[in-house]
Amino acid sequence: MTYHFSVYKHTLVFKESELLTRKFIVLKDERGDICAFTDFHKYISSSKKSYIRRITDDGNNRHYYVAKMLNYVFFDKYHIDTLNSITIKMVSDFLNDYGNCILPNDNCERTKSTVISCVKTIIDFLDQFISENSDKCQIKQEELYKTITIRNKRGKMIKEKVPAFDVTYSGKIKNIFRDMPNKVFDILINHVIRKHPDILMLVALSSFAGLRPAEACNIRRTDSPLGPGIRFVIQNGEITDVILDLKKELNLRSDLKPVGAIKKERIQRVYPVFLDAFVKCYKIYMAYMEHHKYEAEYGALTVNKQGKAITYDNYYQKFRKIVEELIPILLANEDAEIVNYGHLLMENNISPHIFRHWFSVRLTLYGEDTAGLMYWRGDNSPLSAITYLQNKGELEKQYRYVNSMLFDFMSWQADIEYGGGK
């Protein structure tokens, strides 16, 4: 019988509608059945250097980093019986194998930032474990890390723990393919309107309000008993603003299944230039939903065939099928740029995040500064905004400058078929 460590997620509802997810590291057998729960989760601290954390903090990816390290030292390369037996060589070997993508049964390519996140998580985890088991551990804290003083993103001098040994990474980074010409965007969104209107608002929320795909899955209908997820501001009979509620991750399904994480809890608005396009999409979608069921007691905006709120995983799989349908459409086009993009899609994978990238490129070309991009994208860090602004010159060469007149892509066929957009 072989075993491995895995992450188990338990979800419950508190305060009547808010979702609370807790992760545990469990031991599973070769059939995937849980044999035992461990207490390793108690050594996994929040990524924020704070004495307290939000009750909704689920640990993000930290549990997965730790589970991978535990499998490495208990089963894959070394065969220790207790974590007290871990040595600094084992830790160093794991982090370097992880950084160079040569772990057993794991050849994933990783970015430098992902490797850094893993290193920090493992150091914090072992630091906490050693502190509580110092009389039993073979490894000492001074062997594990040293404390240095660095300047953070805001220019403030802070202390940070870094490994006391060298960690390398391969640098063989696979570039993420996210570019999408406006012509292709028009074709794609019209294809969604005609063939897949069930995910139209997920596309619109990312393209016109900058929401992350998983965040878009959290948006509720205007009549949701949990509170309106969308509010339309109307002045003199005209919609002048659309406000989106992302303040809390709520339970939107009768089976308690989370639909996706909200990375930054906030109130978000549709970008003004895209207001008309967003409203057109909304009208088309709501006309479509008149003939489809949904769980009214939760009021999720986007639902699956069973009427339950769509999850990010379900959205991702559906999007991949749409891309497969899109490729022959692009290849049959008479425009050389569109045909070329079709060939690129045959060689590169894209995900629903491409709509948020399209949104970010448009805002950069519209002249938004760092603060503006951070606000409209819902970012905590300025790094992404700075990257877009640093590449603005190249973006201006690559894309034509577009104004609000771009958004006449709502074809009359779609308006007739679904009764929206007028």
PLM segments and residue spans:
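Conserved tyrosine-mediated DNA breakage-rejoining catalytic core shared by Y-recombinases
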Residues: 219-281
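Catalytic-site neighborhood detector that most strongly recognizes the C-terminal catalytic loop/helix
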Residues: 377-403
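Short, basic (Lys/Arg/His-rich) helix/loop patches that form interaction surfaces
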Residues: 317-375
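Charge-rich, intrinsically disordered N-terminal extensions
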Residues: 1-131, 422
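C-terminal secondary-structure termini that scaffold catalytic or DNA-interacting sites
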Residues: 404-422
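Flexible interdomain linker/hinge and immediately adjacent N-terminus
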Residues: 135-184
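Basic, Lys/Arg- and aromatic-enriched nucleic-acid-binding interface segment
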Residues: 182-213
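Major-groove DNA-contacting interfaces characterized by cationic-aromatic clusters
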Residues: 263-318
